[in-house]
Amino acid sequence: MGMRMMFTVFLLVVLATTVVSFPSDRASDGRDDEAKDERSDMHESDRNGRGCCCNPACGPNYGCGTSCSRTL
């Protein structure tokens, strides 16, 4: 194998590993859409724009429809 061919193979390997190891935002956004969505059932707002906690862990303290200082 000539020097030019070895350099070309080296560049192809570097390019392939860079593309494979580069994190894709498109793939992760699909999985996290509901977690980031503020209109999901775990994160609601009342008419004044204040948040309320609909998480079952804090639901007894801050029910949906009442304002709480901490939201998900």
Curated annotation (Swiss-Prot):
Residue ranges, annotated region (Disordered): 23-51
UniProt keyword terms in alphabetical order: Acetylcholine receptor inhibiting toxin, Disulfide bond, Ion channel impairing toxin, Neurotoxin, Postsynaptic neurotoxin, Secreted, Signal, Toxin
One GO molecular-function entry: ion channel regulator activity
Tissue: Expressed by the venom duct.
Subcellular localization: Secreted
Span of the signal peptide: 1-21
GO cellular component, one term: host cell postsynaptic membrane
Disulfide bonds, paired cysteine numbers: 52-68, 53-58, 54-64
Removed propeptide positions: 22-50, 70-72
InterPro entries assigned to the protein according to its UniProt record, in alphabetical order: Conotoxin_a-typ (IPR009958), Conotoxin_a-typ_CS (IPR018072)
Modifications the protein undergoes after translation, according to the UniProt entry: The disulfide bond Cys-52-Cys-68 (Cys I-VI), which corresponds to an extra disulfide bond when compared to the cysteine framework I (CC-C-C), does contribute to conotoxin SII stability and imparts a unique binding mode at the nAChR.
Main location: secreted
Biased composition range(s): Basic and acidic residues: 26-49
Domain notes: The cysteine framework is II (CCC-C-C-C).
Entry's family note: Belongs to the conotoxin A superfamily.
Function: Alpha-conotoxins act on postsynaptic membranes, they bind to the nicotinic acetylcholine receptors (nAChR) and thus inhibit them. This toxin potently inhibits the rodent muscle nAChR (IC(50)=120 nM (adult subtype, alpha-1-beta-1-delta-epsilon/CHRNA1-CHRNB1-CHRND-CHRNE) and IC(50)=370 nM (fetal subtype, alpha-1-beta-1-gamma-delta/CHRNA1-CHRNB1-CHRNG-CHRND)) and weakly inhibits neuronal nAChRs.
Other noteworthy facts: Negative results: shows no or weak inhibition on neuronal nAChR alpha-3-beta-2/CHRNA3-CHRNB2, alpha-3-beta-4/CHRNA3-CHRNB4, alpha-4-beta-2/CHRNA4-CHRNB2, alpha-4-beta-4/CHRNA4-CHRNB4, alpha-7/CHRNA7, alpha-9-alpha-10/CHRNA9-CHRNA10. Has no effect on the release of catecholamines evoked by nicotine.
Protein name listed in UniProt: Alpha-conotoxin SII
